[in-house]
């Protein structure tokens, strides 16, 4: 494996397997947003702390010469993971008429800690960000509000109250925030007049009435016989970004699909070589999902242990030990409409169009499915989710 996008997909999949254990309903998160936030921490981590982060994020598999020293600011090799982030973030934050996509990172540090200039220069270079000093010790609640309002401003006010009351105390030393915002229009919009009330079956025994968008047109499509499912790509305007939907053939087929899914299979099934242009009668729910996660326990379970306790070595940030990450909070929002998608602080969205007469393939998302939003040029998964509960 040699690319950041592959490492991101593997990490995304590992996270999903953790979320599956505890969440039966909707799941929605932004793997690239979590990865880039932890990449900033890695830049100041050393020894065991750094090794654990790299292993969990699969950065240890990104090119042979990924990292020399564990705290790597002196990184001139193009294969380096931080260099790849620099390229990726530059690509994502390019302005375009087709869609809005913005990834914003920020570190909020207790003002009594002095951050090394070397570290500040490195996060500015690679992650286009800075450290903001705040008074956690004397004004924790004020600091929390300040961080939340920054997140809100970066996500078009879609992500509010990222850090709930009580999550920041006077002993907090470092809060790492990543916000991602996406708003796109479909390449082919859905006609609102075709949106009708239809049944959505969370399981075989119950249904809910939902607004179902419809469109009959050509899409990239593949039938996955071995897992009894099918996959469809719905491009956004400009085709730089797409929403990919994985739909089980049976109403209750999602669990089986999730059990057979691997990161490698996901990449293989959804690659354009394996899909063909097909006329499809698409039924896609108009939906909105918002999910919040405190990733501390999840990341610990995955092997990132030291960073959350006294063994943390973040001396690459300040020159001495003592900084400990108190938590990793993540919130994601997605809304899917006829026009397209709006997504934030880790977020994604969808839409639908005109009535078919005869059709080659049916793709009726009237039961639980998986979906993700991908940046096609870099093959990076921005958002990943499961929709099973309207």
UniProtKB/Swiss-Prot annotation:
Effect of residue 352 to A: Loss of inhibitory activity
Protein name: Serpin B3
Inducers of expression: Strongly up-regulated in the upper epidermis of sun-exposed skin.
Organism, scientific name: Homo sapiens
Keyword Amino-acid biosynthesis: no
GO cellular component, one term: extracellular space
SMART domains for this protein: SERPIN
Organism superkingdom: Eukaryota
Consequence when changing residue 352 to G: Loss of inhibitory activity to papain but does not decrease the suppression activity to MAPK8
Subcellular location: Cytoplasm
UniProt keywords, alphabetically: Acetylation, Cytoplasm, Protease inhibitor, Serine protease inhibitor
Disulfide-bond pairs as recorded: none
GO terms classed as biological process: autocrine signaling; negative regulation of catalytic activity; negative regulation of endopeptidase activity; negative regulation of JUN kinase activity; negative regulation of peptidase activity; negative regulation of proteolysis; paracrine signaling; positive regulation of cell migration
GO molecular function list: cysteine-type endopeptidase inhibitor activity; protease binding; serine-type endopeptidase inhibitor activity; virus receptor activity
Coiled-coil stretches: none
Main localization of the protein described in the UniProt heading: cytoplasm
Gene3D superfamilies linked: Alpha-1-antitrypsin, domain 1, Antithrombin, subunit I, domain 2
Residues annotated with N-acetylmethionine modification: 1
Subunit structure: Interacts with MAPK8/JNK1.
Pfam families noted in UniProt: Serpin
Keyword Cytoplasm: yes
Site note Reactive bond, residues: 354-355
InterPro entries: Serpin_CS, Serpin_dom, Serpin_fam, Serpin_sf, Serpin_sf_1, Serpin_sf_2
């Amino acid at each position: 494996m040699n690319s950041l996008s592959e490492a991101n997909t593997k990490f995304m999949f590992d996270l999903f397997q953790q979320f599956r254990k505890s969440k039966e309903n909707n799941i929605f998160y932004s793997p690239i947003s979590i990865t880039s936030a932890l990449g900033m921490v890695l830049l100041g981590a050393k020894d065991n702390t750094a090794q654990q982060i790299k292993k969990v994020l699969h950065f240890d598999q990104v090119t042979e010469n990924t990292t020399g020293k564990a705290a790597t600011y002196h990184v001139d090799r193009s294969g380096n993971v931080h260099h790849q982030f620099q390229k990726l973030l530059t690509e994502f934050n390019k302005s375009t008429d087709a869609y809005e996509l913005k990834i914003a990172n920020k570190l909020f540090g207790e003002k009594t800690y002095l951050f090394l200039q070397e570290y500040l220069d490195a996060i500015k270079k690679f992650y286009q960000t800075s450290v903001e000093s705040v008074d956690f010790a004397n004004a924790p609640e004020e600091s929390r509000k300040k961080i939340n309002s920054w997140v809100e401003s970066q996500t078009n006010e879609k992500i509010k109250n990222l850090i709930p009351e009580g999550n920041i105390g006077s002993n907090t030393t470092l809060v790492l925030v990543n916000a991602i915002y996406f708003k796109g229009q479909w390449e082919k919009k859905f006609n609102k007049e075709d949106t009708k009330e239809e049944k959505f079956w969370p399981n075989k025994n119950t249904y809910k009435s939902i607004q179902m968008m419809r469109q009959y047109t050509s899409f990239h499509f593949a039938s996955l016989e071995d897992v009894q499912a099918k996959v469809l790509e719905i491009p956004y305007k400009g085709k730089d970004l797409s929403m990919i939907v994985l739909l089980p053939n049976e109403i209750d087929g999602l669990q089986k699909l999730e059990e057979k899914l691997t990161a490698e299979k996901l990449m293989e099934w959804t690659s354009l070589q394996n899909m063909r242009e097909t006329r499809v009668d698409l039924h896609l729910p108009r939906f909105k999902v918002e999910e919040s996660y405190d990733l501390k326990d999840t990341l610990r379970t995955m092997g990132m242990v030291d960073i959350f306790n006294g063994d943390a070595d973040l001396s690459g940030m300040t020159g001495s030990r003592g900084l400990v990450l108190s938590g990793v909070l993540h919130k994601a929002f997605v809304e899917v409409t006829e026009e397209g998608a709006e997504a934030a602080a880790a977020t994604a969205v969808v839409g639908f169009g005109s009535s078919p007469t005869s059709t080659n393939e049916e793709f009726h998302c009237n039961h639980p499915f998986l979906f993700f939003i991908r940046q096609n040029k870099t093959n990076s998964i921005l958002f990943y989710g499961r929709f099973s509960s309207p």
